[in-house]
Each structure stands twice: as structure tokens, then as C-alpha cells.
Amino acid sequence: MTARFRTVFVTSKPVIGMVHLGALPGTPLYDPSVDLIAAARADLHALQAAGFDAVMFGNENDRPYEFQVDAASSAMMAYVIGQLRAEITVPFGVNMLWDPMASVAVGAATGAGFIREIFTGTYASDMGVWSPDAGKAMRYRDRLGRSDMAMLFNVSAEFAHSLDQRSLPDRARSAVFSSIPDAVLVSGQITGEAAAMSDLEAVKAVLPDTPVMANTGVKHDTVADVLRVADGCIVGSSLKFDGDTWKPVDPDRAQDFMDRVRATRA
């Protein structure tokens, strides 16, 4: 476990709640009549009131996704976080799908404690063939003076299939050796779908000293089992009204989720 991870996440097996911003400027679904700040504020306060260990701001609504995020989208993400900064009482992170460099830039600019992205591997995806550069992203982080910002590596990308012939555990183990992530994330096939427990178990078995987190599809009735294996989780869709990714956070669902987490920890 890296010093950065321990510094950002003081709780054992942290649970990170997602603040999915509405579609941002420069994307097809952007609606200028939507108050992005008010919507993000409501989700943020619901998650903090429920007791989430951390929150992460993401641009899940910026469909169709791109490998290089529009500058206007990054600027708006940074602006929204800046407007809410004084109200954030827990560690927070940023993810600009599917752009590692934009994630680094926005995370650095807003004072985020961590970022999430795909940083390693080669994938065939809905967006095309995809080969991120972990070395470039990490060096960029350091040039921006944010070597303290933790980088969480998703090693099983949603909406994509790895072109690497190695097994997921081998790819995860190799990524840790070659690219020094602060944590490894294991995902399902798309947003809101769970990673197979067998995948979580296999990756954790080969990375006993590296945090391995469940990245997608953790639900109220599975979180206890997930946290018996994983070193934490990131959750979004399960917390929304009707469990719908595109709806706001339901304070009652968020509270119930963390009540179950606390029962597991006890």
C-alpha cells in the first residue's frame, strides 16, 4: 500500500461515492438550462450525510465518450468543483472519462486527493482502439506539482475488451510492477455492472500488498461480500433513485448503503 493511498484514505476499505455531473459543455447531451452546480451539490451533500469515506466527481453523462475530453468540459468540471470546494468535507477525486491527461489536469487544478482512469494496456472499445500512457500521465502529474495525488488504475476497462492475451491477474500484476499505481480497480463490462467476484479474488490473490478495489456494480446486497475480498469500492448507480445511473443520488439509498457498510465493518 502506497503512502499516497494511506494519506488520502484514512479508513480501512474506503467506500467512494460518485457525483456524476450532468452533461458538460462541448458534449451532445449538454443542456444549458440544467444547473450543474445545484445538482452536484445535492448529490455531494447526500453522500456526505450518509457517511461515505470519499467522493469522486465524474463526467459519466458526457456520451458518446472520447479519448480526449473537450477543453470546455474540463473547464466546467473544474469550475463546478471549485464552486463546491468549501462544502466538501471528505477526500475527493476526479475522473474525466476516458482521458488520463484531463483527469490529471482537473484533479491537480481542483486540489483532488486522487484520480481514476485507464492508464495501462491496449483495448478495443466502443470509442475505438485505446492505448493510454501511464508514464506520460504520471510525469504530467508531477510536473503540475501534485506528486501527492493518488492515481487509481482501472485495469479492466468498461465498454472495452483488452487486446492483451495475458490474464487479468497477470495484467494487474504487471501494471503494478511497471507503472506503480496507488491502487488497482476491477470493473464490470459497463457502468453499473459488477465485476465478477472471481476476478476480484484472482487479482487480490496476486496483489496482496496493493489496494484492489471494486470499481463498478457494487450493490446494497453485495457490498458485504465485496468488502470481504476487495480493499474498498467505488459506487454510483446503486445510490441513485431507482438504481438508475442517470438519476440523482437518493439520500435514503445512500444512507442504507453505508449502514450496511458500517455493519460489515463492525
Where in the sequence are the language-model features?
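Catalytic cores of alpha/beta
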Residues: 33-34, 94, 99-112, 170-171, ...
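Conserved anion-binding
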Residues: 21-24, 102, 106-183
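Alpha-helix-loop-beta-strand connector modules within alpha/beta enzyme cores
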Residues: 11-12, 17-18, 66-94, 132-153, ...
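Conserved, mostly hydrophobic/aromatic
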Residues: 17, 47, 55, 115, ...
